[in-house]
């Protein structure tokens, strides 16, 4: 699963990407220093794995992963090919969701592409370019569907959905703000609309702003806008996150977080929220060889989850032996879990839950 980090030039995208991945993407105080997108594979923080590792003492611990893609800074006119517009739009089309970095801090030493700080204007600039690109896609799709309608009436349903989305786009709204049922979503899935992608707003703030996020004018403006489209906002000071990421050990990181009065790093929040944004969760396998988190979509049934480990396990699925992480931690061992009758045997219709610890039984 891929999250595209987007934003106007000089808002802190590449610095955020560097901090998240420690990949050292070129970062400079001028537009377009990222042309080909940098891709970083990042482990999803999960303390459940650490606790299971203490219990099982495995040879290795494997976290779930998520990919972040640092996409070139966008400018007005991108939908018409301005700046790096065409490349930007093709790269953003390939990601599963969007993390939009918005500059909310004042600093005369860091030039703003529009000369002043206005997070709502910046969000509107990016959203407008994506909306214009989507309108072009919708118009082409409508034209084709109307031609096909003459031969097959089933295209009327597609036309109705496209028309509904077009009206929202023309009103300056994103496609994700349009309520669609499952059938409607399926009809336009292969249109690969940009503004239908789930979006997370990252408000890049100063250290001073971070100390009082509830009362910050810029952050509250972004939250208000995000609420209208059911998006989440995470305020973070990307400069602090860069410093934290450069520290070698967890003790130093913890000490710095305590000094700043923070429970966890903003990056951990971004990674976890990105995982949620994509409707993902983890089931766990635990034993002496390995403790591991496996990524699945929420609502996945047991046989399909088994297929994440190996296709043979899905094909020959018999049952899943399941205990919840909380039950195992409370009882302290798998033997105690079995004695209390907390180890369940689940069949092919069982819907997996986040934190299920599973042993799949199969026969091929």
Please report, for each region that a protein language model flagged, where it lies by residue.
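Conserved nucleotide-binding/hydrolysis micro-motifs of P-loop NTPases
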Residues: 22-23, 48-49, 73-75, 103-109, ...
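Structural motif
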Residues: 353-358
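Short, glycine/charged-enriched secondary-structure capping and boundary segments
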Residues: 81-84, 113-116, 215-218, 248-250
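C-terminal-of-GTPase-core extension/linker across diverse P-loop GTPases
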Residues: 2-6, 17, 144-351, 363-364
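Flexible beta-alpha connector loops of hexameric P-loop NTPases
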Residues: 74-80, 115-130, 149-154, 210-214, ...
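Conserved G1/Walker A P-loop phosphate-binding module
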Residues: 1-111, 120, 139-140, 145
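Amphipathic alpha-helical transducer elements in NTP-driven molecular machines
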Residues: 32, 46-49, 62-68, 82-95, ...
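Switch/coupling subdomain of P-loop NTPase systems
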Residues: 97-98, 105-133, 137-140, 196, ...
């Amino acid at each position: 699963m891929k999250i595209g980090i987007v934003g106007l030039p000089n808002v802190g995208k590449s610095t955020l990407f560097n901090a998240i991945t420690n990949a050292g993407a070129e970062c400079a105080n001028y537009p377009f220093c990222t042309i080909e997108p940098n891709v970083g594979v990042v482990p999803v923080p999960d303390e459940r794995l650490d606790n299971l590792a203490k219990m099982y003492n495995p040879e290795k611990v494997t976290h779930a992963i998520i990919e972040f893609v640092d996409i070139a800074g966008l400018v007005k006119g991108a939908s018409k090919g301005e700046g790096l517009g065409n490349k930007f739009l093709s790269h953003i089309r390939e990601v599963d969701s969007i993390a939009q970095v918005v500059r909310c801090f004042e600093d005369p030493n860091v030039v703003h592409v529009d000369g002043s700080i206005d997070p709502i204007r910046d969000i509107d600039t990016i959203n407008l370019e994506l909306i214009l690109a989507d309108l072009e896609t919708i118009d082409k799709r409508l034209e084709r569907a109307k031609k096909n309608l003459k031969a097959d009436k089933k295209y009327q349903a597609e036309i109705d959905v496209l028309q509904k989305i077009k009206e929202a786009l023309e009103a300056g709204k994103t496609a994700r703000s349009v309520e669609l049922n499952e059938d409607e979503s399926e009809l336009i899935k292969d249109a690969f609309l940009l503004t239908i992608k789930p979006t997370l707003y990252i408000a890049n703030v100063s250290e001073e702003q971070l100390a009082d996020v509830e009362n910050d004018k810029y952050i509250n403006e972004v939250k208000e806008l995000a609420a209208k489209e059911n998006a989440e906002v995470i305020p973070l000071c990307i400069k602090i996150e860069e410093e934290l990421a450069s520290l070698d050990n967890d003790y130093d990181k913890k000490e710095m977080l305590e000094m700043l009065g923070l429970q966890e790093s903003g990056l951990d929040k971004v990674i976890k929220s990105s995982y949620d944004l994509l409707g993902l969760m983890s089931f766990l396998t635990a034993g002496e060889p390995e403790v591991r988190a496996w990524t699945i979509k929420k609502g996945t049934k047991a046989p399909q989850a088994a297929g994440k480990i190996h296709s043979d396990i899905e094909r020959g699925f018999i049952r899943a032996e399941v205990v919840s992480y909380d039950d195992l931690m409370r009882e302290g061992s798998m033997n105690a879990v079995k004695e209390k009758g907390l180890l369940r045997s689940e069949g092919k219709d069982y819907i997996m839950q986040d934190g299920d610890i599973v042993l799949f039984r199969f026969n091929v």
